[in-house]
Amino acid sequence: MQSINIMKRHWLSLAIATFGLTLIFNPVAAHAEPFGFNLVPASDPIATCLPDAVARVTVFPREEIRGVDTLELRAHGLRPNTTFAVFLTEMPVPPFGAVQYIGDFTTNAHGTGSVRVDAIIDEAFAFNNITGVRTDLNHVVFWFADPADDEDCVPGSAPAHFDGDGESGVAAMSSKNFLPGAPLP
């Protein structure tokens, strides 16, 4: 009887120790903290045209838990009732390099808008299977989704290709304030 109690205590101690070590060495716990950063106007003409523009990106790294991270972008001081296309990019300035289109948001009558995207953000990359080159996408940039919407800021600008229909305006906000580094790991 006494040997059974000793054995039960041994197994209980082992279970508690295993659980404790799992909590201490769990890699998910080390990477699960949300982090945020600000975007700035993508160019001097945009900064002049939208002097109150502010955009905040918050990333919730949850890929190890949910299979995806969450990126939340909140902006204000933009053009009212305007749609913007959001991308992860290799570089925050032209020519931008490799990019990934992740979503759109439309501002309200006060120039405020937001978007929440579930995707792999913390480890986003583009891969060229022909060259074998992997390119990390460590920046966030958003463009005017309609080329006509940027005309007050950058008159006569040529349409860019940063939208789902292949035609956009100029870049509005970017993470260029992190150069030469990047805000995403």
Residue ranges and their predicted role:
Residues Q2-A15:
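Bacterial N-terminal signal peptides that target proteins for export
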Residues I4-M7, F25, S175:
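Generic cytosolic/nucleocytoplasmic N-terminal low-complexity/intrinsically disordered segments
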Residues H10-L12, T22, L71, Y101:
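Generic hydrophobic-segment detector
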Residues L21-A29:
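C-terminal segment of classical bacterial N-terminal signal peptides
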Residues A30-P185:
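N-terminal leader/targeting pre-sequences
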